[in-house]
Amino acid sequence: MGQKIHPTGFRLAVSRNWASRWYANNNNFAAMLQEDIGVREYLKKKLKNASVGRVVIERPAKNARITIFSSRPGVVIGKKGEDIELLKSELQKRMGVPVHVNIEEIRKPETDAQLIADSITQQLERRIMFRRAMKRAMQNAMRLGAQGIKIMSAGRLNGIEIARTEWYREGRVPLHTLRADIDYATSEAKTTYGIIGVKVWVYKGDTLGRNDAPVVEEVAEEKRPRRNARPGGDRRPRRDGEGGGPAGARRGAPRRAGGAGGDGKTGE
């Protein structure tokens, strides 16, 4: 009870795309997947100060193409491209195939879920109050165009002995609307009291397709007529004897007990 489905996995092939895009047979699939996980962990440690949001790995025809989304591309590239060349050579050793590295800039890091989660965990490790860090991140995201944001922190918050979970939400975050563009990410803060987990949901509006098609406004449904409404607007005239009473009798008027004599007997 109370558990939420992973927003990215729920929307795969509907409004989200995979982070690893390649095909493999049954023999190579596990090894290639493990290789992707190792590459992402290596890049996360290597580019810890570069504010990396996500890494997309593609494998076209015995090559590898890695796209790094970062809010600080200058840190990744380095002076005269030295750092990125070293990074490319290290990745080629790990993957065993020619590697092409592309850098994409994140224009609004305040609305990127992974960067928000990493920022909060870094503040928690510096002993900043978790409520202050969460609310500041929510205010920045809403100010820069997010339609809704929800942040959850779990663990020994403020060093208390009993772990608990606290979450805050601003705006709307429709988790079960498939066309809703929900950016979801997690991060962990390693504090002296233990690990504090942070989850972030950011609602950026509705999309059609895989984050590239615009939203088409829904056409308002025509008002359906009532079942007893007639084209002319007037009700059908009532026929004599309809409704169970004598002709011309008003609804609710008392019925006479007998026939014409009114004594309850007939034919006498």
From Swiss-Prot:
Coiled coil: none annotated. The keyword Nucleus does not apply. Residues 39-107 form the KH type-2 domain. GO terms for molecular function: mRNA binding; rRNA binding; structural constituent of ribosome. InterPro entries: KH_dom, KH_dom-like_a/b, KH_dom_type_2, KH_sf_prok-type, Ribosomal_S3_C_sf, Ribosomal_uS3_bac-typ, Ribosomal_uS3_C, Ribosomal_uS3_CS. GO terms for cellular component: cytosolic small ribosomal subunit. Residues 216-268 are annotated as: Disordered. GO terms for biological process: translation. Residues 232-242 have a biased composition (Basic and acidic residues). It comes from the Bacteria. Residues 248-257 have a biased composition (Low complexity). Residues 258-268 have a biased composition (Gly residues). Keywords: Ribonucleoprotein, Ribosomal protein, RNA-binding, rRNA-binding. Belongs to the universal ribosomal protein uS3 family. Binds the lower part of the 30S subunit head. Binds mRNA in the 70S ribosome, positioning it for translation. NCBIfam families: rpsC_bact (TIGR01009). This is Small ribosomal subunit protein uS3.
